Amino acid sequence: MPSDTTVPDEYADAALFLGMNSEDEGVRRACKAFFVDRLDGRIVMSLEQVGRCDDIIWGFSRELQDAYYPFMDNLHTVMDIRRLGYEEADVLHATGTELPRSLPVHERLLLGMVRDRKGLLHTASPRLAATTGFAVRAVTGADGPEARFPEPLEDLYQQSLALRVPAEAL
């Protein structure tokens, strides 16, 4: 009997994406390493998680937004990020009894999507990282030299660091 060698789609949430600009240096470096390591691969983000990134960034001054967005825009262009909307089955999983009611609705919707589509969620969210029984992997510390994007993306990333996201926003 052949074994299933299908690699699950890797999902990223807003906490992981914005974690690249975290005030916490360990989180920042780990999240950046995640994206650098997958720059030539593919990840999936729900449309809502992409929108959550914008919602948080829009809370900063126009000057900080202008420093941040060139990096984000370029990363979304050069990296294969599949942005997907929810399907009915995702919502049904999110509203079912198997997902913890202690999680906010947006996180239950994301877990429902990942579970329904048999993916693997990578996150910097302490709440999601503490959730057991689901395909969730918390980003871990990055040892050694800091990972670097190829130029000109690295330069744009360094400029984006004018904006730092507080840990509680992740």
Go through the PLM ranges and name each one.
Residues 133-144:
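Active-site regions of enzymes building and remodeling cell-envelope glycoconjugates
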Residues 12, 46-47, 122-125:
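Short His-Asn-centered micro-motif
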Residues 80-132, 163-170:
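Active-site neighborhoods of divalent-metal-dependent phosphate/nucleic-acid chemistry enzymes
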Residues 17, 50, 128-129:
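A generic structural signal for short hydrophobic patches within well-formed alpha-helices
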Residues 31-36, 69-72, 109-111, 129:
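Short amphipathic alpha-helical segments and helix-helix/interface helices
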Residues 1-45, 57-66, 147-170:
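Short, well-structured N-terminal submotif of metal-dependent ribonuclease cores
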